[in-house]
């Protein structure tokens, strides 16, 4: 099943809450998720594969167009689609546009609603949002309010999702929480650290690639992790470096402990920033970066 919705409606935070650990990065900026992330929820009565998709939006770049194509392809493969609406924002044209796209691509797929971020509003506001989402989806539709931050209604949401999914074989061992490879997860952790505190268009211009992971020849038990951050203009590189390299060092300081935990090893993080001019609109560079 997958979560769909406008950018920044809490899809990635909810994915992490259901899985029980962090597999999807989160940021205050919209359009943070750039590829479908599969989280695996293990229950006594079910194994649920939750797909966190990039937010469907009206694209401004070739990257945006390709992300939308990926999202729509994901819809077509799902057994259940859940549209996410924040409790603190009114349903608007963007939500209706997404719902129309979902129904065009996957007209026969069951659809449910999830009201996210209920910890931010009053009970009365949640009740009003419940009525509004029922009106949007249909009075017989399942709609569940939930807070990924506090965990309120988490188990109820999983119960409803389980009831709506068809029976099928178990796909993953009990110790698997995602099918993302290690390099992808490392790149995402570095990108999350790089996005922290950025404003305007710069977050959309940041891409990350893991160059290599090799044993440190001088430090047994330590891995050298070589990572490249790409931006589109020299001025953006200057911003990421920060005054006297402070922002750059902050990225390393924030990402390294999480990479150590992921690899279960001490890590030397070698980070470089390179300019890849207008990569978001360059088909060749997009292909190179996995888009």
Q: Which ranges hold each PLM region?
A:
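PAPS/PAP-binding and catalytic site of the sulfotransferase fold
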Residues: 14, 18, 155-164, 227-231
